[in-house]
């Protein structure tokens, strides 16, 4: 869901604001969505774009059970824009010039060479998207959980791993999750709940020496003309003013991020009467991220250079303690 400024809905996990990216999908029991005005009344201005309520799995009374699940898959672009070929571009350019009363820019022989690929270095027809999306996009997911307890104490603990290879070179994600949920009823009137979760996420993505970041690579791939060769006959790169996006991929320059996220939630509820109770809840959130971006210089050809080498590093640390009485 998104509105102005690409705003996202608020995510509440077991009563505390969190991120869906840090969850193991195997730990989710239920998901519900609030979109009416009541959500803003309950959660404030952050809920203006709706609220996603996530409940994680809890322990059940009974003999301890161990469960393992795994799945595997591959990703590919579902739909890509179709761009004109070099021959089509040349033909359309000539037509536009004819409407303007100008002479053709391309001869019939040149258009034919663009179309038949007989001289790919001088009359290229580069499919930049084919050069970008070269990887399998293999992904895997594993989760093992233990569930059990009795009427007094119940527990659910799980360990998960998600591995995801990108559909472009040097793009990957590895995520590890650990969760422990414990529920207890020491007396008929007292109920306690405790949850602690931890996620460790490692991300890698290609960057570039032009302005840095992955977004610029996608931008240039969707802008550069098919008439620009990926490489020339002498092995140097064809370029536009901004460079060559596939040359950036070839440089093996990457941004690497490591994220650590921990969330602990505890609550106590005392019921005086079936209709009257008091509940206290406290939570602690910790987030840390290390980001390193290596921008490598590149000599595309004798006349075009981007550089010099640069290393960008950013460290982030945040923690938060919250409490409520309801």
Can you name each region flagged by the protein language model?
Residues 1, 14, 47-70, 142-144:
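N-terminal periplasmic accessory domains that precede
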Residues 3-4, 18-20, 37-42, 59-62, ...:
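Short beta-strands and strand-coil junctions in structured, solvent-facing domains, enriched
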Residues 6-8, 26-28, 37, 47-51, ...:
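Extracytoplasmic
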Residues 9, 14-41:
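Short acidic/polar hinge/loop motifs at secondary-structure boundaries
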Residues 23-26, 43-48, 171-174, 208-210:
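Short, glycine-/polar-rich solvent-exposed loops and beta-turns at beta-strand/coil boundaries
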Residues 53, 67, 143-147, 158, ...:
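Outer-membrane beta-barrel architecture
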Residues 60-125, 136, 166-173, 177-263, ...:
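Surface-exposed loop/interface segments of Gram-negative outer-membrane beta-barrel transport/assembly proteins
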Residues 149-152, 184-188, 270-276:
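Outer-membrane beta-barrel strand-turn architecture
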């Amino acid at each position: 869901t998104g509105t102005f400024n690409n705003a996202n809905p608020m995510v509440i996990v077991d009563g505390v604001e969190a991120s869906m990216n840090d969850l193991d999908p195997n730990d989710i029991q239920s998901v519900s969505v609030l979109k009416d005005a009541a959500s803003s009344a309950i959660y404030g201005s952050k809920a203006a774009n709706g609220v996603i309520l996530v409940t994680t799995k809890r322990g059940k009374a009974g003999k301890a059970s161990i469960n393992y699940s795994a799945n595997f898959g591959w990703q590919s672009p579902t739909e890509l824009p179709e761009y004109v070929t070099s021959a089509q571009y040349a033909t359309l350019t000539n037509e536009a010039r004819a409407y303007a009363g100008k002479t053709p820019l391309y001869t019939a022989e040149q258009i034919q060479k663009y179309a038949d690929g007989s001289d790919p270095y001088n009359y290229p027809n580069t499919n930049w998207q084919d050069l970008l999306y070269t990887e399998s996009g293999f992904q895997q997911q594993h989760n093992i959980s233990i569930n059990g307890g009795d009427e007094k104490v119940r527990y659910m603990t799980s360990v998960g791993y998600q591995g995801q290879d990108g559909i472009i070179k040097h793009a990957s994600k590895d995520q590890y999750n650990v969760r422990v949920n414990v529920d207890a009823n020491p007396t008929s009137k007292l109920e306690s709940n405790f949850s602690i979760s931890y996620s460790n996420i490692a991300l890698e993505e290609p960057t570039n020496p032009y302005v840095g970041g992955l977004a610029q690579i996608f931008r240039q791939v969707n802008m550069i003309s098919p008439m620009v060769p990926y490489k020339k006959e002498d092995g140097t790169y064809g370029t536009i003013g901004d460079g060559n996006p596939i040359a950036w991929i070839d440089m093996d320059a990457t941004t690497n991020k490591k994220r650590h996220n921990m969330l602990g939630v505890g609550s106590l509820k005392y019921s005086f009467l079936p209709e009257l109770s008091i509940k206290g809840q406290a939570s602690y959130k910790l987030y840390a991220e290390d980001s390193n971006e290596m921008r490598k210089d590149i000599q595309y050809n004798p006349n075009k250079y981007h550089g010099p080498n640069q290393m960008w590093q950013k460290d982030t640390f945040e923690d938060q303690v919250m409490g409520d009485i309801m």
